[in-house]
Amino acid sequence: MNNFKCFLILTILFASSAFAEKHQFYYKNELILVEIPEGFCDASENEFGEFMVEFIDNQRKNGMDGPELQLVFDNCLDDLSNIYPWGYIGTVDIGQNNYTIEEMQNLFNLTMQEQLGEASYVKKLSSDLENAHKNTLKDYGVEAEVNLIQDTGVIWYDEDVVIIKGINTSVSDGEKLEEIVIGSSTLIKNDLAINFYITDLLDNGNLILNYSSKLEKASKKTSLLV
């Protein structure tokens, strides 16, 4: 099974460039700048990025609830036979509230810890994601058994960001594939969170510290761009 087909099975909700790129979009008529994690490139205009935008949009149509996609980024190789690691950036509209950014980030951190530590919540979330994912795969003619966001939880947080991890597993044509997803959420306004996700093959080495560091830096730099 080639990497692109493997990617199709597990895609979800997680040579390097020498500098960090920035991406911009509008939120409620306000220009927002975000920092792309170091070592990754904007994939908006290549084949992989265009496909990913379509695939994630189809997942949402099939019932996947999650951040609104703003950007897909890749490993800068522009090679469909070598797509890992890759990731995306999304936004979460929290809604109008009377909290400061600092208060909302703290509340966000606590909520993530509580929800991802609650077995019934994680089971329901996993089931919903798996159904949306499998239905989307069927749209592309792929049949697979998938287990998403296993072994999930908060691995680190501070006043600026919360970082989580999860494991995705799939079996297709008798072949098993495992991915690790590292994600982060940072509040840049009291009603807007920026979520980053990096996905890689689980057997690609010690990834948690490496990707957590990249997401922490990208999140903190993004918060300074506001």
Indicate where each model-derived feature is located.
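Sec/Tat signal peptide C-region and signal peptidase I cleavage site
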Residues: S16-A20
